[in-house]
Amino acid sequence: MLAATCNKIGSPSPSPSSISDNSSSFGKGFHPWKRATASSCSLGSSLSSFTRNGGGLSDSFGTNTSTGSSAFSLTSGTSSNSHFGNDYSVFQTSVSNNSQEPSHQPMFISKVHTSVDSLQSIYPRMSVAHPYESWFKSSHPGIPTGDVGTTGASAWWDVGAGWIDVQNPNGAALQTSLHSGGLQTSLHSPLGGYNSDYSSLSHSAFSTSASPHLLTTGQHLMDGFKPVLSSYPDSSPSPLGGAGGSMLTGGPTASLAGSPRSSARRYSGRATCDCPNCQEAERLGPAGASLRRKGLHSCHIPGCGKVYGKTSHLKAHLRWHTGERPFVCNWLFCGKRFTRSDELQRHLRTHTGEKRFACPVCNKRFMRSDHLSKHVKTHSAGGSSGSGSGASGGKRGSDTDSEHSVPGSPSCHSPDLLQAPESVPTTGMNGRASSLD
């Protein structure tokens, strides 16, 4: 369709000889693009001539017969080489050396093609299947025009076996492919200059398989996260066999995981322990059955020697030696830390003012259970103590309660509890008086 339109436009065009170079008037006309006979044009373009000679300006869409095909060309005087030749090599037009007219510099590309046959004659290296292949490749200065279309019908958007194939002018290629297969887009672009920079990414950065040189550092980093102490074969944890046990001994502790006799001590209903008594009983084997029955767990710190009946108590005791306080008070602006959970619960009562321990006789309440037990002893005192002992007992109970109470805590002394100590000695005195009578 384009060729037919061009033929229609080119038929009524006037002769190029009608325009004189020395004429002062403007001669305008359209002339079809014709291939040069005197000069060789491998990738020529149709350009128009704006010539300025002497006192006349010729603004015409004509061609100079001596310089071959030229459209939109600008007279440049004595310059015979285009300064756009390196960047726009596809638009260059070969000019005869023996031409009398000034050389013309190509500026614009012509989009008028007479026929498909003329494409092959004008662009002999370009395939008809992809008419824009030469324009794309030649627009890049790094790729010579001689390499255009050397692969025949293959174009720059063809799909191959790899992922990216960037070719440089020297023929070296950077291939970064996915091993799973897929697209390969041969990009003939200036990225070929980065071949040396990205050559190390070949078959590594985009590969689905593990690359040895990339995973070497990661494997060394993961080695630091391996468990330092091997666990026991069974699921029962050791209360002292963790990092705290090795930190307390000051030397290498006996590893129970690798010893063959460690399985003899693994029976249900018994928690594992690394205290000196348990280690001695395990060393003796069957002869240490008496030590196991006692169930005594001693502290291994030299100079301490405290003995506990439960491993949990020994574990809490060892925190005093290590300074570990894992239980933190979450009250606002407090943040105190404690070695035992019951100590933390007792401390929280100082913030809330709760007195959860009540006397069964006088209904007096206390924050701590040991304070309540001391108060109960005042009610169970002997008859020889008399009323004075009862009054002094009530006084000691109130002193003990107020001593361990936090000043300023809410509901620390309620009115109904303050009257309770006065009624208790009265009932006690009346009861004792009636019994004596």
Swiss-Prot record:
GO biological process entries: embryonic limb morphogenesis; embryonic pectoral fin morphogenesis; positive regulation of fibroblast growth factor receptor signaling pathway; regulation of transcription by RNA polymerase II
Any one GO molecular function term: double-stranded DNA binding
Residue stretches of biased makeup (Gly residues): 383-395
The encoding gene: sp8b
SUPFAM superfamilies noted in UniProt: beta-beta-alpha zinc fingers
Comment field on protein domains: The 9aaTAD motif is a transactivation domain present in a large number of yeast and animal transcription factors.
Keywords on record: DNA-binding, Metal-binding, Nucleus, Repeat, Transcription, Transcription regulation, Zinc, Zinc-finger
Record InterPro entries: Znf_C2H2_sf, Znf_C2H2_type
A Gene Ontology cellular-component term: nucleus
Protein name: Transcription factor Sp8
Zinc finger motifs (C2H2-type), residue ranges: 297-321, 327-351, 357-379
Motif 9aaTAD, chain ranges: 154-162
